[in-house]
Amino acid sequence: MASREDCVYTAKLAEQSERYDEMVQCMKQVAEMEAELSIEERNLLSVAYKNVIGAKRASWRIISSLEQKEQAKGNDKHVEIIKGYRAKIEKELSTCCDDVLKVIQENLLPKASTSESKVFFKKMEGDYYRYFAEFTVDEKRKEVADKSLAAYTEATEISNAELAPTHPIRLGLALNFSVFYFEIMNDADKACQLAKQAFDDAIAKLDEVPENMYKDSTLIMQLLRDNLTLWTSDACDEE
C-alpha cells in the first residue's frame, strides 16, 4: 500500500491533470489511514469530491432543462430517452453522495479532534445530503433534506460557539446553509436572515481577521452579499 505522503502527492498530480476520480481514490486512502487529516489533506479531499460531484450536478441540470423543453414541445419519444439518461446520471450522483457520506461518517468525523475539523466535516455532510435532495423526490427527498438540516444545524451550533464570525469555515457554512434554505426548503426569508446575520457578524469583526484568512473570509462575505442581493431582488420581482 502506498504511503500517506505518496497518496497525497499523487492526489496533487491528479488535481493538476484534472483527473478528479483518481484524486478521490487517493484521498479516500488517506482518509482510511489512522491519523486525522491535516488541513491540507482535508482541503484536497474536499476539492476532489467537489469536482466529481460538480460535473455530475451540472450534467443533471442540463438534462433536466432539456427534458422540460422537449416536454413543452410534446416530443414524447425524446422525453422518454432523456428520462432514461437522467436516471443514469442520478444513479451516478447517488453513488457519489453515498460514497462521500460513508467516508465522512466512518472515517473523518470520528477522528475530528478540533472544532474547526468537526464543523468542516459536518458542513460537508450537510452539503452532500443537500446535493442528494436536488435530484430526489417525495419521501427520499424529505429524508435527505432532514439529514442535511440536522448536519448543518449541528455544524452551526459548534461553529457559533467555537469559531470567530470571520472564520472562513464558519462563513462557508452560513453560505451553504442559507442556500439549503433557499433552494431545498424554498424558504427565502430564512435564507436571507441567515446570510445577513453571518455577513453582519463578520463585518463587525473584520478588523480582527488574521492576515492568512483575510482573502478567504472576504471572498465568502462577497458571495453572501451577492446571494442576498439576488434573493431580495427575486422577492421584489415576485411581489
Curated annotation (Swiss-Prot):
Domain of life per record: Eukaryota
One example of a Gene Ontology biological process annotation: signal transduction
Q: Which Pfam families match?
A: 14-3-3 (PF00244)
Q: Which GO terms describe its cellular component?
A: cytoplasm
Taking the record's annotation, the residue ranges forming a coiled coil are none
Family, per entry? Belongs to the 14-3-3 family.
Q: What does this protein do?
A: Probable adapter protein.
What this protein is called in its record is: 14-3-3 protein 1
Organism field: Entamoeba histolytica (strain ATCC 30459 / HM-1:IMSS / ABRM)
